[in-house]
From Swiss-Prot:
This is tRNA uridine(34) hydroxylase. Pfam families: Rhodanese (PF00581), Rhodanese_C (PF12368), UPF0176_N (PF17773). One of its GO terms (biological process) is tRNA modification. It comes from Staphylococcus aureus (strain MRSA252). CDD domains: RHOD_YceA (cd01518).
Length: 318
């Protein structure tokens, strides 16, 4: 495989995010890179793909900048680009938590745990493990025994914690996320909220899965990623599927977006059920006039109506 996918972040001061974003986009395009990068006064958060040569040049370019000289890149091999376009966007935050009083992870953050230390935490009954990701990420794969916050956006996590604080009272709290960036700020917020013993998986799930000692142990399912790959394997010790098909509940690790462009809900569904239910999550979405699955597959009006009756069968067996 001649391509690489990079995942990285760095909390550091960027004085002019707008100008930085403009210059950075030009550099990335000149090196034929594709991906999504967010920049703000608090730092950079990115994931991109390119050939090995181009991604190596990118990493060297970043490490030559004093602000990013020690930035860690998580690297996956790939057969081609994992993105269709290149975006570099200035933002208020590089990860949106939208706190009234912001947290600076450079000054306030939870204790870093290595993969081996995190594995010990997973084995400790007195430690609470919180998944800091969204519900659809958790449903595809997560660490065994981790708590699933019922959220669809990271910014909703603090409110969920406040509502469920009794679950974590007087216990050691350890949190994890994909690459570590969300936990940097979230664990700092937990400390400010009065939680005394707070730690985080340093480098996130991506680092844990590549560690030669842990080899992804205790991870069930796949890890959701925000690129064209959709998911990647983590556990090198044992393979389990925990995702369930939206319609029939059978084991499934295939995510699609609902074919209704006004819905776009992510659901786990087999190719067979995607066709059967017109790529939609519900009857209302399946009959939507702009159904993308219907358009992409040139389904006739009669066939469309016929497949809509599959939802009647679904409700009868529910």
């Amino acid at each position: 495989m001649n391509y690489q996918v990079l995942l990285y972040y760095k909390y550091t001061t960027i004085d002019d995010p707008e100008q930085f974003a403009q210059d950075h986009l030009a550099f990335c395009k000149a090196h034929h890179l594709k991906g999504r990068i967010l920049v703000s006064t608090e730092g950079i958060n990115g994931t991109l793909s390119g050939t090995k040569e181009e991604t190596e040049q990118y990493m060297a370019h970043m490490h030559a900048d004093e602000r990013f000289k020690d930035m860690v890149f998580k690297i996956d091999e790939a057969e081609g680009h994992a993105f269709k376009k290149m975006h570099v966007r200035p933002r208020k935050e590089i990860v949106a938590l939208d706190l009234e009083e912001d947290v600076d992870p450079r000054h306030t953050t939870g204790q870093y745990l290595s993969p081996v230390e995190f594995r010990k935490a997973l084995e400790d009954d007195d430690t609470v493990i919180i998944d800091a990701r969204n519900d659809y990420e958790f449903d595809l794969g997560h660490f065994r025994g981790a708590i699933r916050p019922n959220i669809t956006r990271f910014r909703d996590l603090p409110d969920w914690i406040k509502e469920n604080k009794a679950l974590f009272a007087d216990k050691k709290v350890v949190t994890y996320c994909t690459g570590g960036i969300r936990c940097e700020k979230f664990s700092g917020w937990l400390l400010k909220e009065g939680f005394e013993d707070v730690a985080q998986l340093h480098g996130g799930i991506a680092t844990y899965g590549k560690d030669p000692e842990t080899k992804g142990q205790y991870w069930d399912g796949k890890m959701y990623v925000f690129d064209d790959r959709i998911s990647v394997d983590i556990n090198q010790v044992e393979k389990t599927i925990i995702g369930k098909d939206w319609f029939d509940g059978k084991p499934c690790e295939r995510y699609i977006n609902c074919a209704n462009p006004e819905c776009n809900k992510q659901i786990l569904v087999s190719e067979e059920n995607e066709a059967k239910y017109l790529g939609a999550c519900s009857y209302d979405c399946a009959k939507h006039e702009r159904n993308r699955y219907v358009q992409a597959n040139n389904i006739s009006g009669n066939e469309w109506q016929q497949r809509l009756t599959n939802f009647d069968d679904l409700h009868q067996h529910a």
